[in-house]
């Protein structure tokens, strides 16, 4: 039996919980977090978005209040998310959450009215341009050795490994110290993640490759990037755009991998303009 994911709502309640005589026209936006964290990472922006939208925050399996539910393969995880998301929602996925959001748009299109990815990509791991690898297959992303190091280090000290990953996420941002502190607070305020799910999350970052599929995404799409992001480098933006030409792309200045923490006002403005369009 599949466990139901815990989630919380800001701004209103789910449509089927509304009294029959109450009309509900608020856009419904779902926020999906990244590896090693939990929905608390959105605590600074969720109240701002909730002023004009109904905001649903979900801890991914293996993280936060869903730490007891194992993170598994991509398709099963997306099906778990779909079971607690209403139809015609706006799905916003950050980092690993962006991978899940893209797959959700592909395999459960009725759930996704609009798609937003933040500091995300269809394939996180870099692919080198070598003799064995055709030049057109080369891809900018996280060096394979970095992800393998995290995988090895998890078995020794998972807390230190997560902290190191957070530092990389904040690296380069003009507000790196503030960003790092906010990310740490989000972790500490929630139950610790499951170590097995941390490992599985890294495997998803290593193995999931949606490059051949994202061109089939039919929903209006917004891709938000940080110019200083080292995990999803700015130079990768053009390659992603080629694969999904109809997507809108915004590169935020002076921010790294967590733009909604570095500049929450500008970030929310970008999101709300897309939602209202």
Language-model segment annotations:
Residues 8-68, 74:
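Conserved HGGG/HGGXW glycine-rich cap/lid loop of the alpha/beta-hydrolase fold
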Residues 75-89:
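Conserved acidic catalytic loop of the alpha/beta-hydrolase fold
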Residues 93-97, 101:
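Gly/Ala-rich beta-loop-alpha elbow adjacent to hydrolase catalytic centers
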Residues 106, 111-156:
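Flexible "cap/lid" loop of the alpha/beta hydrolase fold
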Residues 155-208, 212-213:
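Conserved alpha/beta-hydrolase catalytic His-Asp/Glu region
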Residues 217, 223-225, 229:
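Short beta-strand/loop motif that positions the catalytic acidic residue
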Residues 230-236:
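Conserved alpha/beta-hydrolase "acid-adjacent" motif
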Residues 252-268:
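Catalytic histidine-centered segment of alpha/beta-hydrolase-like enzymes
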